Amino acid sequence: MKNLLALAICTILLQAAAQSQTEKWDLRKLIDYAAKNNISVKQADVQARLTALQLKQAQLYQLPTASFSTSFGPQFGRSINPTTNLYTNNELFSQSYGLSGNAQVYNWGRLKNNIAANEFSAQAALVDIERAANDVSLNVATYYLQVLASKEQININEVQIAQRKAQIDVTAKQVAAGTVPELNLISLEAQLATDSSNLISSKTTFDQNVLTLKALLNLDAALPFDVETPSVDKIPIESFADLQPEVVYQLALGNQPLQKENELKIKAAEKNVLVSKASMYPSIFGNYSLNSTYNNKATDLTGSKIPYFDQVNENFRQSLGLGIQVPIFSNGTNRINYEQSKLNLKNNLLNKEQANQTLKQNIYTAYTNAVNALEKFNAAKKNVASAQKVYDFSFRRYEVGLLGTLDLITNQNNLQTAKLQMVASQFDFVFKMKLLEFYKGQGLKL
C-alpha cells in the first residue's frame, strides 16, 4: 500500500514537473516551425522538385540521342553472309555492332519554348512553396489568437463562477435566517450550473483550438503544448492612415505569393501555346549511324581467315542524313492540343482575375473588421472605466457600512470581467491590424 502511495505521489510530481517545463510558443516560433514542418508546405516542396525535374528533361531534349546495339550468334541453312552480302549454305557465326541517333535541327522553336514554359512553371512551383507557407502562417496566427481568446474566456467564466458561489453563500445564510425565499437560492444554483456549463464549453473550445494549432504545426496531439501570451500594450501597430485598403491592395498585388505565382503560370501558358502551335508544322531532323560486322567464315584472297579486329575495321561504315517530318494527319491531336493550350491560357488569366478580386475583397473586409474591432476595444475601455468607478464608489460605501459584502464582491468581479473582456478585444483589434500589415507585405509578427 505504501509503495502504491509513493508511486502515485511520484507520478503526480512528474506530471507537475512536466507541465512546469512545457515550453511556451510565441507567434514567431509558431510560424517558423509551421513553415518547415506543415504537411501542405512539404507537399508544395515535393511538387517544386518534380517541376524542376521536368525542366531538366526539357533542357536535355536539345541534345542528340544515341543508342548502341550489338547482336551475335550462329546461322544455319541458306542465309546471307553479313560481311559479303552473298548467300551461303555454310554454318557461320556472326556479330554486328551499331551506333545510331538523331538530333532536332529545326522545329519552329518548339524545344526553346518548351524549355521557357518549364522554366516559368519551375519558378511558379517555388513561389507556391512561399504561398503555402504564407497560408499556413495566416492560419497559425488566426488559431494563435483564438487560443489566447479562449484562454481569456475561461478566465471570465471562472470569475463569473466565483461571483455566483459568493452570491449562493450569502443567499443560503439569508434563507436560513428567513429573510429571503428559498426560490432565490434555487435560482442562483441554477445559474451556477449554467455558468459551469459555459466554463466547460470554453475549455472545450480552447482544447479544439490547441488541437487545430498542433495540426498546423504537424505536432503530435498528445504533446504538452502552451502558447505565450504577449504583452499586448507593447505590440507596435501602424496607423489606419498607413493601412488604407486601396494602398494595401496595390502593394499586395506585388508582394503576395499567389499573385506572383499566377503571373508566372500565365507566362508558362503563353509559351505552351507556341509549343503546341509548332507541333502542327514540319520539323527537320538529322540522323547518323555507325555500323560494323564480323563472321567467322570471312577469308582474304589467299583463303586465310581474316582476324576479328581486322574485320571490324574493314567493315566499319558510317552514314549521315537529314530528314523532314510533316504532320499531315494526327487524328486531330495536334489541333486539339493547340486549342486546349489557348483555353488553358485563358483559364490562367481568369484565375489571376479571380485571385486579385478575392484579395481585394479580403483586404477591404479586413479593414472594416479592424475599424469595428477598434470600436469594440474603445467600448470595452469605457466599460472598464465605468466598472472601476462603480467599484471605487461601492468600496467607499462598504468601508462606512453602507454596502454589503456580496454587493462589493459583485462589483469587484464585474470590474475583473470588464478588464478581461477589454484585453480580449484589444488582442482582436491588434490582430486585425496585423492582418492588414500582412497583406501590405510586412509578414506576421507581434
Region locations from a protein language model:
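Bacterial N-terminal signal peptides
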Residues: A6-L13
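Bacterial Sec-pathway N-terminal export signals of envelope proteins
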Residues: A18-S67, A221, E228-K267, V371, ...
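Small/polar, glycine/serine/threonine/aspartate-rich low-complexity segments that form flexible
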Residues: Q21-E23, S69-A103, S231-F240, L274, ...
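Acidic, low-complexity, intrinsically disordered peripheral segments
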Residues: A6, Q19, A221, Q421-L446
